[in-house]
Amino acid sequence: MQFAKMHGLGNDFMVVDAVTQNVYFSPELIRRLADRHCGVGFDQLLVVEPPYDPELDFHYRIFNADGSEVAQCGNGARCFARFVRLKGLTNKRDIAVSTQTGRMVLSVTDDELVRVNMGEPNFEPQQVPFRAVKAEKTYIMRADEHTVLCGVVSMGNPHCVIQVEDVETAKVETLGPLLESHERFPDRANIGFMQVVDSQTVRLRVYERGAGETQACGSGACAAVAVGILQGLLSAKVRVSLPGGELDIQWDGPGHPLFMTGPATHVYDGFIHL
């Protein structure tokens, strides 16, 4: 099987063309491939499939390193767009794809950055899903001896965003896994730790569902900005600084789609016998 290794700000992927190759990935195989000592090693596996709808270009599937399939990965979407152009699967600059939960348009700019229409953030608890009586800008959550204030949103996948004074000292290693599997998130959640520098700048660390802390999380950056705007902390255009680099996020508020712009890097091509 041929594949490419790619990353978006250090969030790394194994990307596989399932348009011209016949492939099947069991959870066990994905876990073996994800092993950084005995396999290829990655945060997520991205699979390019033929479109389910003739109006679209491709179907986009995402698997975490633990073998679970998820509906959204923003950094992966940028790498997906670069991959299909690099491999000659399309020469379009605006690429329409379906995912497990919806549709996306991926736009490759002249300088090879990728702008992704991530759709409209969804704050309805049952759509996240999140157990709450009604939608709120801020929720109180308790986990063991910890009590935190957070925002909750779906960007096609569930996110919990906590504002912190300093991301460097944030309790990512302890609070991350506690909140990821909290009973109020029936499908688990990605946990973002956001430091607001000013209305146009945030620093962010993300503990990703099924992957742990990563160098960058595109949908997590989108979620953090959406929550920050809803809470009145941020303006419509925000630069998000993650351990792996920076993303530009734009959201004009409820009723509008959110856009993410950032790089996608091709590292190498490989071949593996399964």
UniProtKB/Swiss-Prot annotation:
The protein's name in its UniProt record: Diaminopimelate epimerase
Catalytic-site annotation from UniProt: 73 (proton donor), 217 (proton acceptor)
Lineage of the species this protein comes from: Bacteria, Pseudomonadati, Pseudomonadota, Gammaproteobacteria, Enterobacterales
UniProt organism field: Pectobacterium atrosepticum (strain SCRI 1043 / ATCC BAA-672) (Erwinia carotovora subsp. atroseptica)
Pfam families reported for this sequence: DAP_epimerase
EC number: 5.1.1.7
Keyword Nuclease assigned: no
Location within or outside the cell: Cytoplasm
Record GO terms (molecular function): diaminopimelate epimerase activity
Binding site for substrate: 11, 44, 64, 74-75, 157, 190, 208-209, 218-219
Pathway as given in its UniProt record: Amino-acid biosynthesis; L-lysine biosynthesis via DAP pathway; DL-2,6-diaminopimelate from LL-2,6-diaminopimelate: step 1/1
Main location: cytoplasm
Residue(s) at site: Important for dimerization: 268
Family: Belongs to the diaminopimelate epimerase family.
